[in-house]
Amino acid sequence: MGITHEFHIFLVDENVSLKSVSLLKGDSYGCNIHLKNSECKYITFILVLEPDWSEIAEAKPIRIRLNGKKMRTQLLTKTLMSIIYKAVIYVEENALVQFYSDTDRLYTDMYPTFLIDMDKQHYHILDNGYTYTYIDSFISECDKQRYLTSDIGENGYEDSTEEEDNEEDTDGVCLYCLEEEEEEDEDEDEDEDEDEEE
């Protein structure tokens, strides 16, 4: 059968759920999220891993990069059923957020990719990768009670994945939403030139 973890991501402030983000098979989990945003704001992510312990003794930590730069994830709670992390980022404009347990492209190329337009409240799956992922435009009451209650994190974990990530920062990051806007601007300029010629 192979290893089948469950991995879900909740954008708390946007009330959005990214469900079944984990690979169909394999000891790896992560995704790419393109954030389309026109104002400065903090964004809170709750990351829920439900490990398949059948073939592993320890779950890999979840790491995060914002526009290629390493950020901190806080371990809130760890039980037999689930491992819950929290990540808070500050964005001033469009951004790329990457969650990952591995850096090997054998795995990361199979991660799903999402576009979250916070201005228009539109949410899209750009690439399913090797997953059955889907988006809920809300966080269910069941998930709120299981993962977002105030007593989550009372164990006092201070663990962070920031120091464990020894990979170099990447400067060349491709932003889907930025490229899309640039293409639209170029099309508008061409239309204006044609109107002037007429």
UniProtKB/Swiss-Prot annotation:
Residues 156-171, 178-198 have a biased composition (Acidic residues). Residues 153-198 are annotated as: Disordered. Transmembrane segments: none annotated. InterPro entries: Poxvirus_C7/F8A. GO terms for biological process: viral process. Plays a role for multiplication of the virus in different cell types. Belongs to the poxviridae C7 protein family. This is Probable host range protein 2-3. The lineage of its organism: Viruses, Varidnaviria, Bamfordvirae, Nucleocytoviricota, Pokkesviricetes.
